[in-house]
Amino acid sequence: ETPAEKFQRQHMDTEHSTASSSNYCNLMMKARDMTSGRCKPLNTFIHEPKSVVDAVCHQENVTCKNGRTNCYKSNSRLSITNCRQTGASKYPNCQYETSNLNKQIIVACEGQYVPVHFDAYV
């Protein structure tokens, strides 16, 4: 799996325009293989066409949380869903809280301007 493919698996959900129910994160985190071996504590899904997300790599250049300079911030707010592991949940029964948001996203890009890491939303 390339970094770009991993980004697609972990963060892209073009089939839904928003999280359909409060159970969305529980289903999607499992379906996208983020509950194998451990519960990924936090993850964001983006409900926009791939072309829209790829285009962020040509938008505002910002510094990533880790200090690298290959992050880019979207010009507009995008439809995203934030999944946060609930305090009571323990592996292998990973449970998540689902939040629908409209926020600008910050992604790290590599090579031919392809998103490879979700850094933050603002």
Curated annotation (Swiss-Prot):
Expression sites by tissue: Pancreas.
Biological processes per GO annotation: defense response to Gram-positive bacterium
Stretches the record annotates as Disordered: 1-20
Active-site residues (renumbered): 11 (proton acceptor), 117 (proton donor)
GO molecular function, one term: lyase activity
A Pfam short name: RnaseA
Origin organism lineage: Eukaryota, Metazoa, Chordata, Craniata, Vertebrata
Known partners and oligomeric status: Monomer. Interacts with and forms tight 1:1 complexes with RNH1. Dimerization of two such complexes may occur. Interaction with RNH1 inhibits this protein.
Organism of origin: Osphranter rufus
Biased composition (Basic and acidic residues): 1-16
InterPro entries tied to this protein: RNaseA (IPR001427), RNaseA-like_dom_sf (IPR036816), RNaseA_AS (IPR023411), RNaseA_domain (IPR023412)
Record-linked Gene3D superfamilies: Ribonuclease A-like domain
E.C. code: 4.6.1.18
Function description: Endonuclease that catalyzes the cleavage of RNA on the 3' side of pyrimidine nucleotides. Acts on single-stranded and double-stranded RNA.
Protein name, UniProt field: Ribonuclease pancreatic
Top EC class for this record: lyase
Record's catalysed reaction(s): an [RNA] containing cytidine + H2O = an [RNA]-3'-cytidine-3'-phosphate + a 5'-hydroxy-ribonucleotide-3'-[RNA]; an [RNA] containing uridine + H2O = an [RNA]-3'-uridine-3'-phosphate + a 5'-hydroxy-ribonucleotide-3'-[RNA]
GO CC annotation, single: extracellular region
Residues where substrate binds: 6, 9, 40-44, 65, 84
Keywords, comma-separated and alphabetical: Disulfide bond, Endonuclease, Hydrolase, Lyase, Nuclease, Secreted
